[in-house]
């Protein structure tokens, strides 16, 4: 009871000792709003429900004894299955009408809520059952509206088989038609036969009654004029019904119907003349379904021709209970609501295949209605029993069996007797069938609960309903239910495998994910073909880049490195040995991308459209050779200028482009010279110079011979496929040996013409100017052989030789024009950089308005510093140039990223070792140079420094002057600013002093690299080194108390107090420690020199012996040097 004076449904059900469902059904019939067991209702509504339920219980408890005889009659009435099937539809209609009339009198007010099914049963019995005189009276049609609604539900169950034209008539059963009485039954013997309940009618009234009552459809409509409609249907199945009514033992074998099928089986009993009201009252659509002739027979239920088991009757009772629910609504609604009711024309719509546990509970309540006497068969036996005596089983016994039946589902089939077999005495028909159905359709727990409820509440009802169940129609219902029963059994096994699958999924979730990942990986590997050979550019790649080149996942490389003891990330750079180790593990050989690749000519400057306008152009000559072999001096001699004298350190550190005009054969001829650095750090510059050259002049010092950079220059020239002219320089020096140089060059497959080869070799002296003209003549001769041509009438194309940022002029690029003519104002794109030529100057500083093929100029007007080595091309308008630049933007970003990553290049082997020792040290640098080529050279040189213990990290590298921004970055990161041939912007010096940033400026790359290496060594912890002091020999041992003192003679060096000593005895060390006491003539002294005697004492050693050798040394700190791995 709630605080507001209301009561909840579950509280009311506890008070009444009923299930929540029963109370909800009663509320529904009384139109009381109650959605669930927790809904609250007022006291008045609760009283109404109590009254309704008490009336139903009173009706149920009244006729237990009668139910038993009815059971006996039912078993007697069993008829041939064929007759039952034919008659069932018509019987339903007749039954519905007769049932309606009977139900009204039987339970005009009381059974409406819960026992409408009973009234229907009573009406069935009314034609013949003397026990229920009230029910037989059709006069109480006034009350039938409620009861009628219930019957209507049964008919609504759509029991009317397509063959039944009268089925609709029963629905209009609202009409209280008198045909319900036996007279109507007499009109249609078929109806009596078809409805199992009509069997009782047949017993008392012969064939006619069965016809009237047996219509299950008429039960749907209490007042329906179903009887008239029945005659039409009976005509179809008249013959079978007489047989069913007249025959006490129907042809159908009485199979112990499953709990659900039994209710349907009860409907067949209703087909019997006396029992037809039962099917009607069984708004549970099962009864109606059973009445349908086409209803399939379920396993465990009696089939046509077999006697119906008492269990069927019980099921029928359950259905009436459902009909009580439907009473609250419409009969048709009940039938529709029933899940088991099929809508097929061949089966009654109200028929429910299995009896749900809820239905069983409902049936128990209606059991209170048994006040109506069970219908009797013509022979006088009650319809409910197979034998008059057998059927009279006390309801108590049935109740006892009901709970046990579900526990033994296998017992039901045994209960189903063969046609005409007598039912087991003392066992209610509904009990076994209901249990069997419950077991088939519900889980064991639900089945037990429902069966248990039935046993407690429906003892009397069970007896009555079992008697009312029509055997023949029950058989029909059983058949119809049997079909769904099989699929249900199939569903159950199917559900088990499903559960197993679910378990597998839960158990193997991670495995499934791994499997999918492996499948995806395998698919990718199948699609991707690994290269036959891996070419590594500049001996460095990141993990991700290596993974892309090998067409594998980066995680595979990381895993491989991990197993090698190296921890890496996808952005980590790998050195060449590490790359080779990883690639070989995946079966791909590694070939280092030699700088020769950079020297190859990748783009043909001459196009097909230029062929008609080609003219001879000046050659581009690159002067190459080892450092200090005289390349720039040779060019000075040719140009008659002194460039080498003004260059820092006397060495060239970036490419110089010069154009020289000479007189050849009386005609002026031009030659463009490119001077490349000879230092090993400028390999990339030499490669770029070779890439654009037409002729390579190899300078070799006669007194030095072939050196490493000489060999590199030879490889560049061969990669560029350009002819080589050898200039043997410094022939004027002492020790010069041109012949030795020729011999060494021949070892490199460069054979002099004098020795029968094809390589021109000219001995020259740049200082004295010897043979310079001969060298120029040889260059022009080779040029004529090469037939160098270009089209000056087209837009210019060429290569960026060098680029830098000038603080006054902005970005400046040295351009070599290889085809066409470059003019002031031209719009050009150099890689991803857009530019418009604002001004051009030649090597002498003279301004030019245009420059033709093979011209080398410095151009101003670029948006940013272009990359050295990029090719440029002039476009007719700025729009088209911007389109090209936009397409190259992504590549440019990748290039910049590569440059940044170059500053972080790490040898993973060294890094992992440092990390394990906790000694990983870094030197942060900010590098600014005059030109980009210098930046590349310095970065390349830094890569050559040992990195086992200290890693150089370049935070920023760019051409240009040192700015205040650079100083701020260095202050924030603790970096050192290194400038190469550059200056500091205004404010940068002041900012550096204020923040304490170290700024170093260099003009020679040697010094820069030396200082950086020293700085790296400064980060290393100094190491302790043993420094020998002297040696002494023990001559005597003196014991002083517990200790001993050794009298020694200094044989070499000296001994100092507190120094480290090592005592050797027979070449073995017996003690090593500190010298604690040093005395001479009983005086403590700090040291004793060679040739003197002294006494030595050590606190931790007293086992002195004569002839022991004492070695004295001290530990000193020493600066460590970088050790290469």
Swiss-Prot record:
Region (G1): 625-632
Compositionally biased tracts (Basic and acidic residues): 235-246, 261-272, 426-440
PROSITE patterns: G_TR_2, IF2
Domain of life of the organism encoding this protein: Bacteria
Polar residues: bias regions: 192-203
Domain named tr-type G: residues: 616-788
GO molecular function terms noted in the UniProt entry: GTP binding; GTPase activity; translation initiation factor activity
Location of the region described as G2 in the Swiss-Prot/TrEMBL record: 650-654
Compositionally biased tracts (Pro residues): 127-143
CDD domains recorded: IF2_eIF5B, IF2_mtIF2_II, mtIF2_IVc
Biased composition (Basic residues): 485-494, 501-514
Keywords, ordered alphabetically: Cytoplasm, GTP-binding, Initiation factor, Nucleotide-binding, Protein biosynthesis
Family: Belongs to the TRAFAC class translation factor GTPase superfamily. Classic translation factor GTPase family. IF-2 subfamily.
Role this protein plays: One of the essential components for the initiation of protein synthesis. Protects formylmethionyl-tRNA from spontaneous hydrolysis and promotes its binding to the 30S ribosomal subunits. Also involved in the hydrolysis of GTP during the formation of the 70S ribosomal complex.
Family annotation (PANTHER family): TR-TYPE G DOMAIN-CONTAINING PROTEIN, TRANSLATION INITIATION FACTOR IF-2-RELATED
UniProt name for this protein: Translation initiation factor IF-2
The species this protein was found in: Prochlorococcus marinus (strain MIT 9313)
Taxonomic lineage: Bacteria, Bacillati, Cyanobacteriota, Cyanophyceae, Synechococcales
